[in-house]
Amino acid sequence: VYAEAQHGVLTRFDRRSGENIDIQPQPGAGELPLRWNWDSPLVLSPHSPTRLYFAANRLFRSDDRGDSWQAVSPDLTRQLDRNQLKVMGRIQRPEAVAKNASTSIYGNIVALAESPLAAGLLYVGTDDGLIQVSEDGGTHWRRGESFPGVPDLTYVSRLVASRHDAGIVYAAFDNHKMGDFKPYVLRSSDRGRSWISIAGDLPERGT
């Protein structure tokens, strides 16, 4: 059993032995600290019972249930300074609001999926509006940053790879923090190269 707490704390519990160990990936010597979301995405691969994917601002893979980890991506975010982004229409002083105190660290991966039909076909979504795709288990990445009808920098709230067609993936975006409650639901039929909106007649304030 795997359990997660805030900011990337990850544990594995063996129900037979009672063993409970911390398996959170750590940065290597000389590397920058990792940026974990409040609820960092964890995926158990549908292609191997021992393979896990876990994401901070980089994506990690384990092939031994978390005993060891390998980084399979660079930083997949825009690497923006949150203090240079507008809040309520203008750039605020760092101490003006609690954006650096009781909130998630900005610039991390918040959505993650592996195709159940194609091992190593990975989809990553970030809190700063990117969808990154790898078709080879993380060796190469293809960046998507513009999506029809979706405002720039919108939080990628969910990614779902189709169980019926390896080329199809669905994405949902959430922009309520900017006072925008529109539903943003998209589909790609070419592994994230292009997207169309499938929000249809969902309620205007349906987030």
Would you name each region that the model predicts?
Residues 1-207:
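Beta-propeller blade termini and top-face loops
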